[in-house]
Amino acid sequence: DGLKLLAEMREKYGLLIATEMRDATHADKVVKYADIVQVGAKAMYDHGLLTAAGQSGKPVILKRGFGSTLQELVNCADFIMSCGNDQVILCERGIRSFENNTRFTLDLCGVAWLKQHCNRPIILDPSHAMGYAYGIGDLARACTAMGIDGLLIETHPCPQCAQSDAPQQLNHQQFGEMYTSLKPIAQAIGKTLI
């Protein structure tokens, strides 16, 4: 039902749909509805899922596991590519550290390493790294200044009503303000914000 709802939103608003594939047995259904397949951080090492993503014919967002090294992320991306899909987008969404006031630590040093050593698009997910709405704009601005290729930002018309990850959701006004603040940063480094 969720996939059909996403497909309706794509038709109504002309959006591309990215959704997470949690199990290889769901591959046919996800590929039928999604424009972009996402492999979540917890599933980064699931070879069956990576194989299904590699055979999907769709762009794949591969999220880095919170305990995974950069090389392990690259190796998993290479595995997807070995299955016939070179449309792999790497996603940094935070790693586990000794800090416990944020959900994860967004590894900006790792992003710089990936930019230097990998020829793949790199996006960041500050929503999951921070875990709270109040820091997402700052992280998004830092990521944009690094020249990354995209951001995953969680929004909800009523964040406190969200059924999952409510504390990290931006309301539409917060998202609009953040988006506006990213434009001059993107322009300053020769990027276009869409």
Q: Which residue ranges define each predicted feature?
A:
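Structural motif
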Residues: A18-M21, G40, K63, S127
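Generic structural signal for well-ordered alpha-helices
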Residues: L3-A7, A27, L50, L73-A77, ...
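C-terminal helical cap(s) of enzyme catalytic domains, especially alpha/beta-barrels
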Residues: C158-K191
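N-terminal active-site wall of soluble small-molecule enzyme domains
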Residues: D1-A34, D46-L49
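Glycine-rich phosphate-binding active-site loops on the catalytic face of alpha/beta enzymes
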Residues: A41-Y45, A145-Q168
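Catalytic alpha/beta core domains of metabolic enzymes, predominantly
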Residues: T51-P157
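Short hydrophobic/aromatic-enriched beta-strand-loop microsegments
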Residues: D35-A43, V60-I61, Q87-V88
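Alpha-helix N-cap and loop-to-helix initiation/capping positions
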Residues: D1, A41, Y45, S68, ...
